UniProtKB/Swiss-Prot annotation:
The gene is rplV. PROSITE patterns: RIBOSOMAL_L22. GO terms for cellular component: cytosolic large ribosomal subunit. This is Large ribosomal subunit protein uL22. CDD domains: Ribosomal_L22. GO terms for molecular function: rRNA binding; structural constituent of ribosome. Keywords: Ribonucleoprotein, Ribosomal protein, RNA-binding, rRNA-binding. This protein binds specifically to 23S rRNA; its binding is stimulated by other ribosomal proteins, e.g. L4, L17, and L20. It is important during the early stages of 50S assembly. It makes multiple contacts with different domains of the 23S rRNA in the assembled 50S subunit and ribosome. Belongs to the universal ribosomal protein uL22 family.
Amino acid sequence: MTAPEQTFRNKKQRKQQVKLRKPGFAVAKYVRMSPRKVRLVVDVIRGKSVQDAEDLLRFIPRSASEPVAKVLNSAKANALHNDEMLEDRLFVKEAYVDAGPTLKRLIPRARGSANIIKKRTSHITIIVAEKGNK
């Protein structure tokens, strides 16, 4: 087993290093929505310009479009404010949805049995970048 290229003293340093590698990104964690349903919306905006993605999200008739729009807006603001990118050149470089923890609830059924209802959560990540930059 090889040693890692760079070691970190604590979790905070590791998180700061991740932020340095991914300019213009935003994450929404524990969104109370199924990842499968959120992915349908995220797949539409991947690779589009930020302005086009905002317009699309405004008119997509799915409830997942609201949290995705909030994350996109946050990523755009981070890119403009923290990384000093130009708004006209921004596009959605990466957009993905990971499954968060699942809340399990019991529903009583006949003869003393019960069914489990899985209330799924999602982690939405969007990374924006300038066109021409990799």
